[in-house]
């Protein structure tokens, strides 16, 4: 009987080890995410989040006044050892200013992070798959010619999204899920 149960559960257990998914929406993972705007530096950009039944909606307006220029949606700090994965799949839709996926390895704002730009979707749902090692290193918004290293995937402590164009305008970004595989 025990052998039979193990055989039945084995495919499920393997699937759990081969994928890690952050699913958004009411009563799901969206409540662990918060908005951080450029107001932390004196800027006047605005952003807000709203949980829907199956997604998280992040929208706002980027302002360049007072040296502003960004709005971000971030998961609370946690350990994300994603070193067993090669790809990230994201289902989202967006309009307005484009956004980027970000990974942080430090709580300090001035320590370089990693990001990759996401294509706009004209408000149509899109599912993309990106190679994790294609994320690039950035230092305070400036690209450093270095890709994310496989060993750094053990050090990720925050996942997020940030407006990716330093220009005035509205944006809307709705995300269904992030899946590491």
Segments predicted by a language model, with ranges:
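Beta-rich carbohydrate-recognition modules and glycan-binding surfaces
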Residues: 14-181
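Sec-dependent N-terminal signal peptides
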Residues: 3-13
């Amino acid at each position: 009987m025990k052998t039979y149960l193990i055989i039945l559960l084995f495919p499920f257990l393997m699937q759990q080890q081969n994928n890690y998914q952050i699913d958004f929406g009411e009563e799901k993972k969206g409540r662990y995410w918060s908005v951080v705007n450029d107001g932390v530096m004196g800027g006047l950009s605005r952003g807000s989040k709203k949980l829907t039944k199956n997604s998280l909606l992040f929208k706002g307006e980027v302002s360049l006044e007072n040296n502003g220029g960004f709005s971000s949606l971030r998961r609370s700090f946690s350990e994300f050892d994603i070193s067993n994965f090669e790809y990230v799949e994201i289902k989202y839709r967006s309009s307005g200013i484009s956004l980027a996926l970000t990974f942080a390895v430090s709580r300090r704002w001035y320590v370089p992070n990693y990001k990759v730009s996401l294509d706009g979707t004209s408000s149509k749902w899109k599912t993309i798959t990106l190679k994790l090692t294609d994320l690039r290193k950035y230092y305070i918004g400036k690209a450093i010619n270095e890709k994310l290293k496989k060993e750094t995937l053990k050090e990720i402590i925050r996942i997020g999204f940030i407006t990716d164009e330093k220009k005035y305008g509205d944006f809307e970004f709705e995300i269904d899920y992030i899946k590491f595989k």
